[in-house]
Amino acid sequence: MDENKKRALSVALSQIEKQFGKGSVMRMGDRVIEAVEAIPTGSLMLDLALGIGGLPKGRVVEIYGPESSGKTTLTLQAIAQCQKRGGTAAFIDAEHALDPIYAGKLGVNVDDLLLSQPDTGEQALEIADMLVRSGSIDIMVIDSVAALTPRAEIEGEMGDQLPGLQARLMSQALRKLTGNIKRSNTLVIFINQLRMKIGIMMPGQSPETTTGGNALKFYASVRLDIRRIGAIKKGDEIIGNQTKIKVVKNKLAPPFKQVVTEILYGEGISREGELIEMGVEAKLVEKAGAWYSYGGERIGQGKDNARGYLRENPHFAAKLEADLREKFEPTELSREEGDEDTLEDAM
């Protein structure tokens, strides 16, 4: 850069600092680039697929999927993991459907969980913004975008046509929220539902879409698609679901990774089941017929018995998890990838 341009830049930077404060503009090399903090999800497979060891703090995350696919279960397990590490959690229950007994079974400390059941979408997002700006919340879940009903819709008549009202509400709220989320280093998770598109579609185009417009798609750093793909049986009794989770978008590591895990009724994501599956894949756990062995010791005949053995011997499970992390965890846990999406497109 020639001297005239350097002087002009120096004058501009000094004027910006006077008007907006020191640090308003800085060179990237002037600050240490820190690894993004992450909150574990409760699923070792998903933490590894996300590439940073969990869901990123200071970012917006969207989790969507069909009904009863495990969306709320996944977020409650993330809350439990955050609380175990001394964090503070908030749950904005726009659906008015949170079951505290089930949350407790998943490890959530319901006595310390901040809960809001707002009447309107505006109230829910205003409460979320105030909690984020307080700087004291580590993780916040909004369940769900589809239930964030605009005030005009609630006060209107049944059958009133109010096109685009919820999409405008979400776009405005996210413009306001994202800066505060980054400054307060809060993880904000939006749970979303699926709807079917109406009209003519191009061949190969998915008929499914999420509610609340396009704003959330652009502002989210991570988007997870979670779906039930099968049942887990113990004899004739169904004890859980086999669930596929796909990382549809990831600004912090390579996207499009997917995992298949087990969600057991009343227990959530089966940590022991994941350890067995990953152990077999990594050849750390030997499978001979129906028997599973680890470190030369038989741990059970059939997956259900092996799962029970690991649950009864937590030190054994912890050793297997440590071996798996050593084998699977990437050496570079955080890499911010460029995203060419412009926020103007979200409007």
From Swiss-Prot:
Name of the protein: Protein RecA
Biased composition, class Acidic residues, residue ranges: 337-347
Sites where the protein binds ATP: 65-72
Disulfide bridge map: none
Gene name linked to the record: recA
Gene3D superfamilies: P-loop containing nucleotide triphosphate hydrolases (3.40.50.300)
Organism: Xylella fastidiosa (strain Temecula1 / ATCC 700964)
Family, per entry: Belongs to the RecA family.
KW Nucleus (keyword) present: no
Pfam families, sorted: RecA (PF00154), RecA_C (PF21096)
Keywords, alphabetical: ATP-binding, Cytoplasm, DNA damage, DNA recombination, DNA repair, DNA-binding, Nucleotide-binding, SOS response
